[in-house]
């Protein structure tokens, strides 16, 4: 047999073995256990709650405020819009309580004052709930082309705790009371009041801005 033919014969005989080897490799890959993905734990971003001055204290009282431009809108138009928004979306909001009401309305001055009482939820799940009665005063003043709003007199009270005391924002959510570790962390209990209050303030102010954004 010529050498050339011998080499061809050897190659033909080796081919099936090569295929078997390939198949074994493929099977090994198919049954190779998948690497487990590392579990990731979501970390809450507390940056806005840790900002110094996020809870303003004016003359010893916690007072959130802002002035919003509303170009082209008259005082009367803004007054009517704000009054409607406060009544329907805040006083009659989904978590409102029985004492929430308008306490002063003066169209000539563009003044709206509301005493708000509502539930503030720290946790709301089917099997676990943590909430307080949250009361505060809203003062709005409309002018031609702008309005101002202030939230003050903030108080909290657990209504599912017998003889629960009234908690004042000044004693719970200020930088001094709610921040620890040199301002790098929220205090365990006071921190949840600070977080919840800032979130609710942001929601109330956003509601008013959206109502007047025409």
Feature-to-residue mapping (PLM):
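Bacterial Sec-dependent N-terminal signal peptides
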Residues: 1-31
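Ser/Thr-rich, low-complexity intrinsically disordered terminal regions
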Residues: 25-214
